[in-house]
């Protein structure tokens, strides 16, 4: 069960013999979790909680060498998904391509930073399987962003997405939300869509490499601490059992990003299976 594998480190002072299981409760706290990836290979997720910035970063490498970075930024209500995809030069592709998808954060997706920073793992060598397999979140990214004319990009997005020259996307509804809330996120200059996209096919159904189409990019996070678990303490003086936070529930979650590309050959990863 979860209680034998994970605990929330208490900020109280403990006797010295307990401290071997604690990482210092400083600004940054890192957790490495071994997971089974969707292709069956064993991978390692690195989860990094930054209490000062109030964000959590999850990084892992897929079996094909793609490097995935997902940032959950609670302060700005932003989720950034970045994929660094290795190309196949023998097929005329670049050495690598960067995709960046910036959308509004769902606060029920992952536990808050303060609890993530206190999470400890007792058996780091074990391969983890999430307790709950959540479905796929389907995001239609209807706004492409011109990186070189993006105005003010706050540092985190700039650092992650500056190489996503032909693959930086967001959603109109999300930019409106950030604007309405006065959140300093991004000043976007959307790329013009010169084609009526209503009748476009998906890229796998498009035969001509130079035709525009809708591309999809899929990924799954195999292990996320998605909920806090509560236990009942012993009854106090008033005879009441008070609940306290004693661990986490883990989830896996999929994402599918759909977006317009002017040429099918800009979408080599979306093939019919």
Where are these regions (language model features)?
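A eukaryotic "domain-to-IDR transition" signal
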Residues: 96-148
